[in-house]
């Protein structure tokens, strides 16, 4: 089994003429949300072996706050900056086979599209509720967790993942 965590960066400073989009840092509320999400992961005993992270300032800060609660290796990747679902999926499929749990820290709309692409049709009521929340909005610092019944990351297919959790900062 492979477990995929898709974490959108936390709330960042507004885009204004002051700095490049890539260099935008987290707002205080974003830092608090990321710390709360990290605590949620630890409290629920979610383990993540490796993190693939967009190299932007806001994703880097989000990942570092999550690392305060998780023991993971982190790999910063420029090609995940504003990546679409195809690029994210390619990165996931290229993950080492020995890694059973992988997190991608990135941006919308790519993360939301990736979650929607990979999640299977809901089977149970709780799973349906998670799908409805995901379809409503994938806000900053939201986390989707998908399980795949495969032995290799490269075998992940569209609609092949069970959406086992979808958490937003307002849920914490």
Tell where the protein language model's regions lie, with residue ranges.
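Active-site-proximal alpha-helix that buttresses catalytic centers in soluble enzyme cores
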Residues: 2-79, 83, 111, 117-125, ...
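Generic beta-sheet signal
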Residues: 4, 97-106
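A generic local structural motif
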Residues: 37-41, 89-92, 130-132, 150-151
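Glycine-rich phosphate-binding loop signature in dinucleotide/nucleotide-binding domains
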Residues: 44-46, 94-100
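Conserved histidine-centered catalytic loops in small-molecule metabolism enzymes
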Residues: 48-67, 74, 147-172
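Short phosphate-binding loop-to-helix
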Residues: 80-97
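Domain-level recognition of soluble alpha/beta enzyme cores
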Residues: 119-164
């Amino acid at each position: 089994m492979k477990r995929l965590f898709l974490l959108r960066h936390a709330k960042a400073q507004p885009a204004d003429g002051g700095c490049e989009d890539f260099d935008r840092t987290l707002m205080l509320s974003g830092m608090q949300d990321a710390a709360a999400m990290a605590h949620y992961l630890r409290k629920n005993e979610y383990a993540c072996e490796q993190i693939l992270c967009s190299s932007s300032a806001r994703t880097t800060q989000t990942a570092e706050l999550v690392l305060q609660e998780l023991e993971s290796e982190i790999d910063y990747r420029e090609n995940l900056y504003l990546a679409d679902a195809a690029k994210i999926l390619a990165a996931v499929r290229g993950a080492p086979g020995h890694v059973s749990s992988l997190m991608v820290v990135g941006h919308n709309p790519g993360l939301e599209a990736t979650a929607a692409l990979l999640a299977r049709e809901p089977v149970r009521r709780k799973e349906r509720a998670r799908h409805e929340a995901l379809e409503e909005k994938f806000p900053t610092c939201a986390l989707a967790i998908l399980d795949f019944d495969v032995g290799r990351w490269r075998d992940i297919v569209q609609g092949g993942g069970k959406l086992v959790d979808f958490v937003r900062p307002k849920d914490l």
